[in-house]
């Protein structure tokens, strides 16, 4: 009987339960968005919130995995409204096409540069912390050898 309960605990949650978990995260992120002093989309807040919940173990991967996979597989359908908005805004785009293309190119280059710098900083911090651990271990071994 105990073995059966353990197997049930490791079984992924039902699809409807997973939808409820994701909906609750989005609901909470919508509430957080209303209290934030800076404008930030609730979907971004929800992603960060879900990431934190998964990392802390408050939400298990099995509780959101199937719905997450389904949404990821059908992500093209989720971009249809954005595509329709672009088509509806063609009048605005046609007024300054070179300016918009230039802005896209400049913002992409800036994004790549910022990403590169952040990656370098993270790599330096990570290598320093690993180096500090090795240095401490060597110093401890030397101290023990002198005793």
UniProtKB/Swiss-Prot annotation:
Membrane topology: Multi-pass membrane protein
Membrane-traversing stretches: 13-32, 42-64, 71-93, 97-119
CC annotations in GO: plasma membrane
Cell compartments where the protein resides: Cell membrane
Taxonomic placement: Bacteria, Bacillati, Bacillota, Bacilli, Bacillales
Pfam families recorded: LrgA
Function: Inhibits the expression or activity of extracellular murein hydrolases by interacting, possibly with LrgB, with the holin-like proteins CidA and/or CidB. The LrgAB and CidAB proteins may affect the proton motive force of the membrane. Increases tolerance to penicillin possibly by inhibiting the formation of the CidAB holin-like complexes within the membrane, thus reducing penicillin-induced lethality. Possibly plays a role in programmed cell death (PCD), triggering PCD in response to penicillin, and possibly other antibiotics, and environmental stresses.
Induction (free text): Regulated by the two-component system LytR/LytS.
Keywords for the protein's UniProt record, in alphabetical order: Cell membrane, Cytolysis, Membrane, Transmembrane, Transmembrane helix
InterPro entries per UniProt: Antiholin-like_LrgA, LrgA/CidA
NCBIfam families documented for this protein: PRK04125.1
Protein name stated in the entry: Antiholin-like protein LrgA
Main location: membrane
Keyword Metal-binding: no
């Amino acid at each position: 009987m105990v073995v059966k309960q353990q197997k049930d605990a490791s079984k992924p949650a039902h699809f409807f339960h997973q939808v409820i978990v994701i909906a609750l995260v989005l609901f909470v992120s919508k509430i957080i968005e209303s209290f934030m002093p800076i404008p930030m989309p609730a979907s971004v807040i929800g992603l960060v919130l879900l990431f934190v919940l998964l990392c802390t173990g408050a939400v298990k991967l099995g509780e959101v995995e199937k719905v997450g996979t389904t949404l990821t597989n059908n992500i093209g359908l989720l971009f249809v409204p954005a595509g329709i908005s672009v088509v509806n805004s063609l009048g605005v785009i046609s007024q300054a096409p070179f300016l918009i293309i230039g802005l896209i190119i400049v913002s992409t280059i800036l994004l790549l540069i910022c990403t590169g710098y952040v990656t370098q900083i993270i790599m330096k911090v990570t290598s320093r912390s690993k180096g500090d651990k090795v240095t401490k271990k060597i110093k401890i071994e030397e101290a023990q050898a002198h005793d």
